[in-house]
Amino acid sequence: MEKSFSVFFIPCVSKILLAFFPALFSIRFVFCTFAKILSMKHTEISTLGEFGLIKRLTENFPIKNNSTEKGIGDDAAVLDYSNKKTLITSDLLLEGIHFDLTYVPLRHLGYKAVIVNLSDIYAMNGQPKQIIVSIGVSKRFSVENLEEIYSGIRLACNIYGIDLIGGDTSASLTGLTISITCIGEGQYGQIVYRNGAKENDLICVSGELGSAYMGLQLLEREKIVFETSGAIQPDFQGKDYILQRQLKPEARADIIDNLKKHNILPTAMMDISDGLSSELFHICTQSNVGCRIFEDKIPIGEQAAIMAEEMNFNIITAVLNGGEDYELLFTTSLSDYEKLIQIDDIGIIGHITSPEKGLALVGRQGEEIKLKAQGWNSLQ
């Protein structure tokens, strides 16, 4: 077992597990070392062997979808998507790049790893059905740690009706790696791409933006305070919501369902994983259009705004460039306006223009600020 562990803080279990039923009501954090957590119980992965580990991690994943003919237990899964399009997406999460185990509980990590994939399928106006999970772990992780990750994966599968149909687990020389592939279905003629936005279309977003990024800034701030001063209790009072948005995001299946109920088919759509500005660039570039979004129309969470003011941070910068909101950004025909305003939790933030007008944010005084694609980039 590795001897070197960085000291980190984790949520007090009695409080943070409330995040799974279904929201964080209050959070109280305690500090401990990773070594101390592992010492509570530590079953070496090698003691189970490959097949024993697979059985232990996947035995409580019942099949839920008719399209899954064969899941775990053979050389390959078998799916049947008769008369429907198949959608496939994949996301790779690397310790130290995409998550920090200083403050991310393993259960939440498993849940979030699933959600970021489901969100991509919903962003295509599809329905996610199956996932494949592959994990690389160093020797500092135990069977119990993997079970924690899989408990979060299982919860996401149960809530969203997803089948776990396969994957792989391998030793890693450093850290923790999680790769999830999600398979979903889309109806013919109903799949929404990024390249369909047209001049005069409305630009819409679900939910509110900036909370996940400000939650991350809060966690990073308190980590630095702990590492430099050894303070035992971080200051998270009144910040439950932004922590939830960072640690346990949700995919907006409800928005897709409501759009269908109101007979609205977006002309272009994607999820907001890397920041509003970056995603607007994707849609406008692929659709060969420009856009105008209005600062006073962008939905911003109250806790996010308060946190930004406390940290002397521009909340609009957080919204444009922060990311990890996993809300839906989409465009629709102007003729859908009356139907759109009947749907809760959707905001109209601007409109599509001709390409020569470029992309701009219209400030509260009417000034136009050129948008830049400065979203989060793991390769930088």
Summary of predicted features, one role per range:
Residues 215-236:
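Short, compositionally biased
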Residues 106-130, 151-159, 258, 278-283:
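Small-aliphatic-rich amphipathic alpha-helix that forms the alpha element of a beta-alpha
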Residues 78, 117, 125, 164, ...:
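Residue-level signal for inorganic ion chemistry
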Residues 33-105, 124, 133, 152-155:
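Extreme N-terminal cap/leader segments of soluble proteins
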Residues 233-281:
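Polyanion-binding loop/helix "lid" in catalytic or ligand-binding cores
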Residues 38-52, 56-62, 104, 140-163, ...:
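Glycine-/charge-enriched secondary-structure boundary and capping motifs
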Residues 80-83, 93, 128-222, 351:
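Glycine-rich anion-binding loops of enzyme active sites
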